[in-house]
Amino acid sequence: IKTKQEIMVRKISFIGVGPGDPDLLTIKALKKIESADVIFWADSLIPEKIINFSLESSEKIKTSTLTLEKITSIMIEKFNEGKTVIRLHDGDPCLYGAVKEQIEILKQKDIESEVIPGVSAFQVAAACHQAELTIPDITQTIILTRAGGRTGMPEKESLKDLAKHKSSLCLYLSARHIKSSQKTLLEFYPPETKVIVGYRAVSYTHLR
């Protein structure tokens, strides 16, 4: 049952759908997908079986070829038509999802939004290998970062600087930098340190 406040305030929802396994969707994410009028989804990252939960009548808009500006423009247009609009993000929207930029654009149009979290790749990788990321007397810290590339890294956030902490280190968007990352990490971590590599980790079979 919706509260009066929920009925009065319409929002655009940014929804994390996890790694692509339908069984790992949150209940809230599933309900949103099942009831949405318009669904934006990255067809290059999110499997169609996630979209299959939606209404047959819902409009599905693929975003893989659209710019962020174009996506938000269409979202605003559909929202102003009185439709329930959601955008699906692989993993969790708050990790490398450009969600802040989208929310700021919506705010300029006085449109409310919400973020619904999803299971992230580092959690799937750890669960697959039954790996605890915070072990007493070894590390109580998890660092989520990337190995550089086209997007520059802030000062003091180079892989070398972060590796000095010898914490559990999760590198996103870094498949092309495995060799250079390995060389850097071996300066600070012992050679026998356990490493999990995942690529398009939709299911456990994509991890080793």
Where are these regions (language model features)?
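Short, Lys/Arg-enriched N-terminal segments with co-localized hydrophobic residues
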Residues: 1-7
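Class I S-adenosyl-L-methionine
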Residues: 7-116, 124
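Short beta-strand segments
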Residues: 15-16, 87-89, 145-146, 172-173, ...
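Structured adenosyl-cofactor binding patch, chiefly the S-adenosyl-L-methionine
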Residues: 121-133
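Short, glycine-/small-residue-rich phosphate/pyrophosphate-handling segment
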Residues: 131-145
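Conserved anion/nucleotide-ligand pocket segment
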Residues: 156-194
